[in-house]
Amino acid sequence: MANDTNPKARAIAAFAEMFFEKARTKTSLSDLEREAIDLGHRCMAEALGLALEALDAHLSANRPKGLRSHDIRPRTLASEVGDVSFSIRRYRDECGCDVYPLADALDIAYGTRISPGAAEFLVEAAAHVSYAKAARLLARHGSSVRPQTVMACMRQAGRLCAEQDEAAALSLYRDGVVPEAESVEKELCMEADGTYFSVQGAAADDAPKRLEVKAMVAYAGKEARGGKVHRKRCAHHALVGTPERLWSEGVASAVGRKYDLSKIERVHLGGDGERWCRDAGRYLPKAEVAFHLDPWHVNHAVLACFADSKLAWNILEVINDGGKEEAVALLEACLDEGLAREKQARSVISYLKGNIDHIALDGPSLGTMESENQHLYGVRMDSFPCAWSVRGASDMARIISRRESGAQVPGCTREGSKGERRRGRREGKELSFYEKQGGSGKVVKSIGSGYLPPHQADTRKMAPGKAYALRKGMAIMDRGI
């Protein structure tokens, strides 16, 4: 052994000895690797439990005065290395409220049965695969949990994301506080679109069968990298809700974290022509916003008018060359000659005329939103048979958009996990304690201005009679007569 005094060296030597004993009975590296990981995780889980107990003992020995010992409780947390079991000391403060020094020091959420690392793993995994598969991935070399536990982790993460996004929107649009940003760009590209997914419990005739996830993305142009064109520094945001929530939260929380909102001068906004897709300008009042009709939607609409795609591409070439009005006239002529499908052609003609000022404008290349909806949200939420609740779909969309933006999905804190009932019980105990103290304080009654100190004045240079009258009057005022 190289160094007997180094804990890391001793641990490595102990593992090497255990792995050697395993290797002597194995015929393949695959079996050895699997057993080595399982053995290592079991040892790590047990060692982590012992370390937590040692830290608890240290904190208890240095606890604040006034805490009295109540009991020692067993605790088990599911983690990425298996179940971590340990004992935790519980104390009571002067108000009769429970105090856990270890949980307070390590910010362990109330009532949780999952470690923060395992919860983070489940949220990340469930954003790619089903809840059942995410649970199996954790159980491969860690703790076993139910799919319902994975769903609870997603719900919690989605709720925390929504709270942060809403707080960012209020801070910007109500309080006028511009968020701190990572970079500065004078010109941005933005795109917005909606995508639909199946709704749970839509068997009733009057129940909606589909829900819409509204999504937006902002990026600082495109660049060639590795033989492909990539968008630069994307900021994503998506939810199930109103356009107002999408834009206010998306601009304040997602875009505002990436780009300094006060420095943005021009925005190229792409969309399919829906009214809500054009609304970004309302939330970026200092920027000049130019709306571009998404070329993908133009191509898709014109191609749907013809059985022969060659005719469609002839019209699209005219559009791309700048002849928007000429292309519409050509499509009308094809309709009159019976070369185009009547129903589709009439709809597309109306669509193109209604957006004629936003077709084939000068500016950077856009047209990425349709593929984004498929590759970010559709690949998880619509790629295999499943249906979503409104809240579940919104939570998933928020989490996926955060992941793709490189932003951290918030975890549950001890303070945030208290809940209204726990908070109310604690406040009740504290109030009862202070009420029983009696005479510990006196609230001075006043009207309008809160507490006012007794009236005083310098009477040393006043005549005795006048000084007496002034002091008497002030005393009467102090007594409230």
Would you name each region that the model predicts?
Residues 1-49, 90-481:
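Catalytic center-proximal scaffold of phosphoryl-transfer enzymes
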